[in-house]
A protein has these predicted regions:
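A short, compositionally biased
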Residues: 38-42
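SAM/dcSAM-binding transferase cores
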Residues: 1-36, 208, 227-269
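Flexible loop residues that form catalytic
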Residues: 83, 159, 222-225, 239
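A general beta-strand register signal
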Residues: 45-46
Length: 269
């Protein structure tokens, strides 16, 4: 069966051959679907927008997790905003001493990911070093600030922050200020910033906002078949630009050559 999925909120989309519909339902917050689509393999779809695919899973999550962490002198505690599929958490839990706090408001996304994406998240939800919270991310961060909890990295693995998206508030100037106050000295904030060809202004807007709070703002990216384009990440830090560093954990896709490629891919896009 051929179905059309959006790549963003602007109506841009692709037609895929859906081999299997594993689950499709409405949660309190959004529509959720997990299907198998030909070459893409399993996909997670929220509000008819593809969030991840089995095909690009390793390159997306390994790049997102390990490029920032490789540039830290120490990494003891990290925060994931969103990330309800559990795959970014899986990558970060490879670091044996790291505690991961994950905040995803939609509990049902996590429940379905436990059931249908187990082969991708490798049961990360059961790891004792993962603290899972289902609440507003900003409320969680405000309470963490009161408790004086500090993070080495904060990852915004949220739905694409388009102008009409609920995620837009999670990358507002006030939100970035809040995240900055939760970072340890030399900590880093990293966010996915969408398809650079379909939504070129997103990268610019996020970098501008990050620049209000961090001495250094940079980006890196991957080529994703799911998007048929270059997918971007933006980071903010007071410790200089990300450099190529050895990766201290086992990865399937990310290696030295690809690390360097990811750091330079957005220069010509």
């Amino acid at each position: 069966m051929f179905v059309t999925y959006s790549l963003d909120n602007n109506g841009v989309g692709h037609v895929f051959n859906r081999e299997t519909l594993h689950v499709q339902e409405e949660s309190k917050y959004q529509s959720i679907e997990i299907s198998t689509l030909g070459i893409l393999g399993k996909v997670l779809v929220l509000n008819n927008i593809i969030q991840l695919s089995e095909h690009d899973c390793e390159r997306y999550h390994e790049t997102f997790a390990h490029i920032p962490v490789s540039n830290l002198t120490t990494c003891e505690r990290v925060l994931i905003l969103g990330g309800g599929d559990g795959i970014l958490a899986k990558e970060l839990l490879k670091y044996k001493n790291v505690i991961v706090d994950m905040v995803d408001i939609d509990e049902r996304v996590c429940e379905l990911s436990k059931m249908y994406l187990l082969d991708l998240n490798e049961n990360s939800f059961e790891n004792k070093r993962l603290n899972l919270h289902h609440r507003c991310a900003l409320d969680f961060c405000k309470k963490a600030l009161v408790k004086n909890i500090k993070y080495d990295v904060i990852f915004a693995d949220i739905t694409d922050p388009h102008p009409n998206s609920p995620s837009k508030s999670l990358l507002s100037d006030s939100a970035i200020s809040l995240y900055k106050s939760l970072l340890r000295k030399n900590g880093m904030l990293v966010s996915q910033t969408d398809n650079v060809h379909i939504a070129p202004n997103h990268v610019h807007d996020v970098k501008k906002t990050f620049g209000n709070h961090f001495e250094t703002v940079g980006d890196f990216g991957i080529v994703a078949i799911t998007l048929s384009s270059v997918f971007s990440f933006v980071y903010g830090s007071d410790s200089g630009m990300i450099q190529h560093r050895p990766i201290q954990v086992k990865t399937k896709w990310l290696n030295k050559t690809r690390f360097e490629f990811c750091l330079n891919i957005l220069e010509n896009n």
